[in-house]
């Protein structure tokens, strides 16, 4: 989702990005 495109968000929610 859009969170994956944001490095900080992806770090906070690692399970959201494959």
From Swiss-Prot:
Q: Where is this protein found? A: Secreted
Predominant location category: secreted
Aminoacyl-tRNA synthetase found in the keyword field: no
Could you tell me which cysteines form disulfide bridges? 3-9, 4-17
Listed A to Z, the keywords are: Disulfide bond, Secreted, Toxin
According to its record, what are the GO cellular component terms?
extracellular region
The molecular function terms of the Gene Ontology recorded here are: toxin activity
Q: In which tissues is it expressed?
A: Expressed by the venom duct.
- Disulfide bond listed as a keyword: yes
What domain comment accompanies this record?
A: The cysteine framework is I (CC-C-C). Alpha4/7 pattern.
Which protein are we looking at? Conotoxin pc1b
Q: Which organism is it from?
A: Conus pictus (Cone snail)
